[in-house]
Swiss-Prot record:
This is Large ribosomal subunit protein uL13. The keyword Manganese does not apply. PROSITE patterns: RIBOSOMAL_L13. It comes from Latilactobacillus sakei subsp. sakei (strain 23K). GO terms for molecular function: mRNA binding; structural constituent of ribosome. This protein is one of the early assembly proteins of the 50S ribosomal subunit, although it is not seen to bind rRNA by itself. It is important during the early stages of 50S assembly. CDD domains: Ribosomal_L13. The gene is rplM. Gene3D superfamilies: Ribosomal protein L13. NCBIfam families: rplM_bact (TIGR01066).
Amino acid sequence: MRTTYMAKPGEVERKWYVIDATDIALGRLSTVVASILRGKNKPTFTPNVDTGDNIIVINAEKIKLTGRKATDKLYHHHSNHPGGLKTRTAGEIRENNPERLIEMSVKGMLPKNSLGHNQFLKLHVYAGGEHKHQAQNPEVLDITDII
């Protein structure tokens, strides 16, 4: 009888990938990034073990919002004070803090538990074309072939 392979945390080999977000739709980029962070692109994927890789996303300021999402998509948060509901559009967030837009999108696609939190910590987003992870020798991942 064959048994299913279950990865152990010490056996996982992690790679580093760089993804250029220029002119890629936010949702399509986020689904690919979330899948790689979870490790679903590997044959050794195990749901209860963090088998994912590290992702560096550059040029977050050049992400594409399709349709009228830049003006119509709203993000809400509350300050926990009376009348403290704050609302910002996706376009405002892209102008002021483009890294946050990708982080919020990817975080919503990860599990809502400690495993998802640890997977989210392996995401590194930069607004410009430069990043500080050259020492890890990241591979350039062209996701236009995937999406």
